[in-house]
Amino acid sequence: MHNIIRQLRPGSLDNLGLSETIKDEMNKWQSQHQALKVNLIIKGNIDLLGEVININVYRIIQEAMNNVVKHAKASTIKISLLKTKDTLKIECIDNGKGFDLTILKKTKQFGLMGIKERAQALSGKFDIKSNEKKGTHLTIVIPTK
């Protein structure tokens, strides 16, 4: 039971903050998937966003990474978080196989739908661009005020 709770809400969010928790998560992904080059960029202070934003941002990034590993067959992924005065912009860009976005609208892709729903629950915006054989680019912009 403790393991399930830890997976739902890692204690490191409270103890280390969002930036260190994400860095730790990226290190885990990198060690488990050594063929995948993970590039993490954090600009601005993302550690004072509040509990609700923190857990949702953590889950968004986790799901984006999961999608890359399961579906994209990418060799690189760039995750960037940019905190400005009023927003947090998250970008996840991979060089994987990409997909036809019209298929996404016809089927229920739960991972991407979950990311979109989390962004919308925070009054944020979700955008996805994908080209077959060229990769996928997710952009999430969340208001922080």
Question: What label would you give each PLM region?
Answer:
Residues 1-145:
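Coiled-coil dimerization/phosphotransfer module
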